[in-house]
Amino acid sequence: MKKQKRDLHQRAYVKGYRAGMAGRSKALSERCHTQARQDWLTGWREGREDMWNGLTPVDGTYKAASFSQ
């Protein structure tokens, strides 16, 4: 099994970050597990903050990729 599939919390965070950078609604978090949903929302908030601070989606993608390593 690949490492990225094992760590659900980190994966949820990165997906939330990317959704936030894309300007998507936080209502899109469809995580059933409470902690994974919280990680997604944390990533979403940081993604929105970075978007508001002027990071481009490309910069945000590099930042999100550094989280997953």
Swiss-Prot record:
Top-level taxon of the source organism: Bacteria
Family that this chain belongs to: Belongs to the ribosome modulation factor family.
Any single Pfam family the record assigns to this protein: RMF
Name the UniProt record assigns to this protein: Ribosome modulation factor
HAMAP family: RMF
Function per UniProt: During stationary phase, converts 70S ribosomes to an inactive dimeric form (100S ribosomes).
GO-annotated biological processes: regulation of translation
GO CC terms: cytoplasm
Keywords: Cytoplasm, Translation regulation
Presence of the UniProt keyword Cytoplasm in the record: yes
Subcellular location: Cytoplasm
Location (main, coarse): cytoplasm
Keyword Lyase annotated: no
InterPro entries per the UniProt record, alphabetical: Ribosome_modulation_factor, RMF_sf
Origin species: Marinomonas mediterranea (strain ATCC 700492 / JCM 21426 / NBRC 103028 / MMB-1)
